[in-house]
């Protein structure tokens, strides 16, 4: 099979979990600096800004996420049918930028917040440890270990030697 057929098969016959992961959008520069992540899975209630296509520069809240097509419906973006009825326009998740997060899901917010803080803590610890020249004592005396290992090896060698002589 050709590579394009294999790629299309992976995309269009993907599992529900894989499709859900494909509905991701990049974060705005402010959110990227705050959370330390580049992209996030879009959920209902997130505030997004369209960056490509006919509806470029329109902001709104996500009203519906369609994992089957990898698209999102945004409040305020609708089209009109011939009879006058209005329907939501689906926009690809990759064509929007997340400008505000729906904070109602505590697990999601904890997972997002967990990446930015340790990096900041690690930088402060590195700065504090630059002045230290002496490594911390681990409580194990390295000098005694080789001697003990050599003594144990010598004992076992001595124990084997008399056996050879007695034969």
From Swiss-Prot:
Entry keyword annotation includes Transcription: no
Keyword annotations: Ribonucleoprotein, Ribosomal protein, RNA-binding, rRNA-binding
A Pfam family that the UniProt record links to this protein: Ribosomal_L26
A biological process from GO: translation
GO-annotated cellular components: large ribosomal subunit
Biased composition, class Basic and acidic residues, residue ranges: 155-167
Biased composition range(s): Polar residues: 10-25
Region annotated Disordered, chain positions: 1-27, 107-167
GO MF term (any one): rRNA binding
Regions of compositional bias (Acidic residues) in chain numbering: 136-145
Signal peptide residue numbers: none
Biological role: One of two assembly initiator proteins, it binds directly to the 5'-end of the 23S rRNA, where it nucleates assembly of the 50S subunit.
NCBIfam families, sorted: rplX_A_E
Sequence similarity: Belongs to the universal ribosomal protein uL24 family.
Oligomeric and partner information: Part of the 50S ribosomal subunit.
Name of the featured protein: Large ribosomal subunit protein uL24
């Amino acid at each position: 099979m050709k590579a394009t057929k294999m790629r299309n098969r992976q995309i269009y016959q993907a599992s529900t979990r894989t499709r859900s992961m494909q509905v991701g959008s990049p974060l705005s520069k402010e959110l990227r600096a705050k959370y330390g992540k580049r992209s996030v899975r879009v959920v209902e209630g997130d505030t997004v800004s369209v960056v490509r296509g006919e509806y470029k520069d329109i902001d709104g809240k996500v009203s519906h996420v369609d994992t089957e097509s990898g698209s999102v419906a945004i409040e305020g973006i609708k089209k009109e049918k011939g009879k006058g009825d209005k329907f939501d326009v689906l926009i690809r998740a990759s064509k929007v930028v997340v400008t505000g997060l729906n904070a109602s899901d505590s697990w999601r917010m904890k997972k997002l917040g967990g990446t930015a803080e340790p990096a900041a803590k690690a930088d402060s610890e590195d700065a504090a440890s630059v002045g230290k020249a002496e490594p911390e004592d681990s409580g194990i005396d390295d000098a005694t270990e080789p001697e003990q290992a050599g003594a144990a090896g010598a004992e076992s060698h001595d124990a084997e030697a008399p056996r050879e002589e007695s034969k």
